[in-house]
């Protein structure tokens, strides 16, 4: 809990005032905040093997500290042998304390464990949100390399209240996300 308190405290004491000065906000309510982090795993191979979903739920629950839910297909697709409401993925939405804990773990522990890591791309969605793709779940310390059966990737989406990509980039940069082509001021 001390990490969570420190990250929230850091936002209130250092990050928010820095963003207010940088973008010349007239009100503190205009300062962008991190609303939620959504972690998603698309598991197309779950159509053939149902146990993959259970394994993925357990792994994502261990990584995030919050129960993961299976996502289901919305329609039939015969070419993929897919039926409506079949589980084809796993997701978790993190808010408040767990969100800050996961962000801390991602920045300080998981990302540095990626092989040949040179930083993450700084491409946003046009509305201040950022999605990061990770190829292997083994970068997280909660995953035991010996016990995994299949290496699975995941998408991590950072949803912010920032209206523009520039403001979203500044917020996530202040939180410590290591962007590749970071602009030095």
UniProtKB/Swiss-Prot annotation:
The keyword Cytoplasm does not apply. Keywords: Ribonucleoprotein, Ribosomal protein, RNA-binding, rRNA-binding, tRNA-binding. It holds the Pfam family Ribosomal_L5_C. One of its GO terms (molecular function) is structural constituent of ribosome. One of its GO terms (cellular component) is ribonucleoprotein complex. SUPFAM superfamilies: RL5-like (SSF55282). The keyword Ribosomal protein applies. Coiled coil: none annotated. HAMAP family: Ribosomal_uL5_B. Part of the 50S ribosomal subunit; part of the 5S rRNA/L5/L18/L25 subcomplex. Contacts the 5S rRNA and the P site tRNA. Forms a bridge to the 30S subunit in the 70S ribosome. This is one of the proteins that bind and probably mediate the attachment of the 5S RNA into the large ribosomal subunit, where it forms part of the central protuberance. In the 70S ribosome it contacts protein S13 of the 30S subunit (bridge B1b), connecting the 2 subunits; this bridge is implicated in subunit movement. Contacts the P site tRNA; the 5S rRNA and some of its associated proteins might help stabilize positioning of ribosome-bound tRNAs. Belongs to the universal ribosomal protein uL5 family. This is Large ribosomal subunit protein uL5. The gene is rplE.
């Amino acid at each position: 809990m001390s990490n969570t308190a420190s990250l929230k405290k850091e936002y209130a004491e250092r990050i928010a005032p820095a963003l207010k000065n940088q973008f010349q906000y007239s009100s503190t309510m205009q300062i962008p905040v991190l609303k939620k982090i959504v972690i998603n795993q698309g598991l197309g191979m779950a159509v053939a093997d149902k146990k993959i979903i259970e394994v993925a739920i357990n792994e994502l629950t261990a990584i995030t500290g919050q129960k993961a839910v299976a996502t289901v297909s919305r329609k039939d697709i015969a070419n993929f042998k897919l039926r409506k409401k079949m589980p084809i993925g796993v997701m978790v939405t993190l808010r408040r304390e767990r969100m800050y804990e996961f962000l801390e773990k991602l920045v300080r522990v998981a990302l540095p464990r990626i092989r040949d890591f040179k930083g993450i791309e700084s491409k946003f969605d046009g509305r201040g949100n950022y999605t990061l793709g990770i190829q292997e779940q083994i970068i997280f310390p909660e995953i035991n390399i010996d016990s995994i059966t299949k290496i699975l990737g995941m998408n991590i989406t950072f949803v912010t209240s920032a209206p523009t990509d520039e403001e979203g980039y500044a917020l996530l940069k202040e939180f410590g996300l290591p962007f590749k082509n970071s602009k030095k001021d």
